[in-house]
Amino acid sequence: RFKKIRRLGALPGLTSKRPRSGIDLKNQLRSGKRSQYRIRLEEKQKLRFHYGLTERQLLKYVHIAGKAKGSTGQVLLQLLEMRLDNILFRLGMASTIPGARQLVNHRHILVNGRIVDIPSYRCKPRDIITTKDKERSKVLIQNYIASSPHAELPNHLIIDPLQYKGLVNQIIDSKWIGLKIN
């Protein structure tokens, strides 16, 4: 993980750690003119590592975004941000996106009253995301909410920390996307 962060820059969904501000000797030796291919490859890798996608999953999202109306890049980021694992991360119910994926895979999360165990589930506006009624599920979410720094919540999400409940208001606005993509 840390090699990826040093190479690509901060990836908030992968880990809360940040790259060192000092310039490493390796990076000084490798610095120079970056080709268009390298820039595109690094941006693609940022998306893959931040959202925890395989190459095939990312290609499917690019294909869907290409067919949709509007800017392909913006539509792609909206599709990725509306995934269930990412919404749990944005709500503060998990410290990282891989942690949110684990919560979903272990069946701790309900969407509109039904268990969803697919991290790539595409949330829609007016979806209600809650935890299972089991004590173990609530304790897990409670620990994440208590330990996470209360960052500003995106305006397309609402959270009720006492009931461990989140609501998707609308499709995300492009200014709230946390990852800077070139």
Curated annotation (Swiss-Prot):
InterPro entries with a match to the protein in the record: Ribosomal_uS4 (IPR022801), Ribosomal_uS4_bac-type (IPR005709), Ribosomal_uS4_CS (IPR018079), Ribosomal_uS4_N (IPR001912), S4_RNA-bd (IPR002942), S4_RNA-bd_sf (IPR036986)
GO biological process: ribosomal small subunit biogenesis; translation
MF terms in GO: rRNA binding; structural constituent of ribosome
Protein origin, superkingdom: Eukaryota
Keyword Ribosomal protein: yes
Domain S4 RNA-binding: 82-143
Keywords: Chloroplast, Plastid, Ribonucleoprotein, Ribosomal protein, RNA-binding, rRNA-binding
CDD domains: S4 (cd00165)
Compartments reported by the entry: Plastid, Chloroplast
Family listed: Belongs to the universal ribosomal protein uS4 family.
Role played: One of the primary rRNA binding proteins, it binds directly to 16S rRNA where it nucleates assembly of the body of the 30S subunit.
PANTHER family xrefs: 30S 40S RIBOSOMAL PROTEIN (PTHR11831), SMALL RIBOSOMAL SUBUNIT PROTEIN US4M (PTHR11831:SF4)
Protein name from the UniProt record: Small ribosomal subunit protein uS4c
The organism of origin for this protein: Alophia veracruzana (Mexican pine woods lily)
Gene: rps4
